[in-house]
Amino acid sequence: MYVILVYDIVTDEEGKKILPKVFKICKKYLTHIQHSVFEGNISMPKITALKNELKQFIRKDVDSVILFSSRNERWLKKEFIGLIDDKSSRFI
């Protein structure tokens, strides 16, 4: 399954401690493409593991994680405006 993950962590005192942990978890499973955005092909068991790890740190009242998924990345159109990073320019 192809996944795009986007997170938003409030950067209060606790958030500053959570942010690097969330980043590290996401990077373990997906490719970092822009600030708090990750993408990649991942199996369902790994998606479950990713979500379970993130739930340990995400504060439901202030932080958020959004997962967009598709069976295959070729069903998505990716269009760039501005700087194109090599990590995310593999396809359009």
What are these model-derived regions, one by one?
Residues 1-37, 41, 45-46:
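Extended, hydrophobic alpha-helical segments
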